[in-house]
Amino acid sequence: MFKELYQYRELLKTSIKKEIRGKYKASALGVAWSFINPLLQVLVYAIVFPYILGNRVDNYIVYLVSGIIPWTFFQTTLNQSVSCIRNNYGIIKKVYFPRVILPISVVCSGLVNFMISCIIILLFSLIWGVGISWHIIFVPLIALIEGMFALGVGMALGAADAYFQDLEYFVMFLLQLLF
């Protein structure tokens, strides 16, 4: 598999670029959505939990951002990985290439988006005076591990999704429930 991926590395690079560019292509705000989406989620949770439900946690906003951004990365890449084989069925039927390129490109583009979103975590940590630990050097490694986990689960569920197309919606619901 790795030898074949190496042989098709240009296709993999092109597919990753297509995923990154295609995500915000028709959007007026473009890549800014990498910042806006998590900020809007944080805003909703920051209002609902501490003020309406009475949940009080020190540095709650930083706590919230530190959880929402990695979870959103996992949720998005897993959802897209589950359906990417079925969504590209027309191409798969016509041209041979390693099918694993499709979910790998989804996860890699998600990693790029996640690393951009990590800037929000840094900013919130500095603004709220939490500070930044030297442990931050492990974020890329942890993101890579999280991405590999999403890739593995996404590939397994993607194979099943080819036969049970409702699985995609069940996975979306389950991931929302788990958060």
Name these PLM-found stretches.
Residues 1-179:
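Hydrophobic transmembrane alpha-helices and immediately adjacent juxtamembrane helices
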